[in-house]
Amino acid sequence: MQITADMVKKLREMTGAGVMECKTALTEADGDFEKAVEVLRKRGAAVAQKKAGRLTKEGIVTSYIHFNDKIGVLLELGCETDFVARMPEFKELAYNLAKHVAAMNPKYVTREDVPEEVLEKEKEIYRAQLENSNKPAAVVEKIVQGKLEKFYEEVCLYDQKYIFDDEKTVKEVVDELIGKIRENIRVTRFVRMRVGEE
C-alpha cells in the first residue's frame, strides 16, 4: 500500500511520534492505523527499556489537591534534562499521575519498591487461606503468585490501570512518553495525604 503524507500526518497527530517513525510504522502495518499505533506503542516500550538505566537528575514536583480539600498529593517526576522538564506533555503527565495517586492510593512506585517483609507477609496470608483446600503444593504456589500479581496491581503505581485510559497501565503511559521524547522519565516518589489519616 502507498503511504501518503496525509496518512503520516494523521498518525503523527494521533500519537505525537516523529515523521519517519510514523512512516515506518504505517509501512509495517500496511496502512492500518490501529496496527501502526500498536507498532509505535511497542517501539515506545522498547525505547523505554533502553533508556531505563539513565539517570533522571532533572524533573518537577507537582501537586494536586482534590476539590474538597481532603486529599492532597505531591509527586516528583524525574527526567534527564531541564528541557524535557519544561515540556507541556511532561508537566501534564506529572499532574495526571498526581491525580491518579489521589484516586487510586498506591503505596509504592514499582513492585521492586515493595519491602521483602511485606511480600512475605502477603504470601503467608495467601497460603493460610489455601491451607485446607487440599490442592497440590504446586497449584497453591501458582494461586499465591496470581494473588501477588493482584496485590501489585493494587499497591504499585506502575502496575495500576491508568485512570485516564484503563486499557493501559501507568508504566505503559510513562513508557509511551519516553518513546516519544527519547529520554528516560520516572516517578521518583510521591506522598498522598488525606485529612484524618496518618
Swiss-Prot record:
The keyword Ribosomal protein does not apply. InterPro entries: EF-Ts_dimer_sf, Transl_elong_EFTs/EF1B, Transl_elong_EFTs/EF1B_dimer, Transl_elong_Ts_CS, UBA-like_sf. It is found in: Cytoplasm. Residues 81-84 are annotated as: Involved in Mg(2+) ion dislocation from EF-Tu. Keywords: Cytoplasm, Elongation factor, Protein biosynthesis. One of its GO terms (molecular function) is translation elongation factor activity. It holds the Pfam family EF_TS. Its main location: cytoplasm. One of its GO terms (cellular component) is cytoplasm. CDD domains: UBA_EF-Ts (cd14275). PROSITE patterns: EF_TS_2. Signal peptide: none annotated. Associates with the EF-Tu.GDP complex and induces the exchange of GDP to GTP. It remains bound to the aminoacyl-tRNA.EF-Tu.GTP complex up to the GTP hydrolysis stage on the ribosome. Belongs to the EF-Ts family. This is Elongation factor Ts.
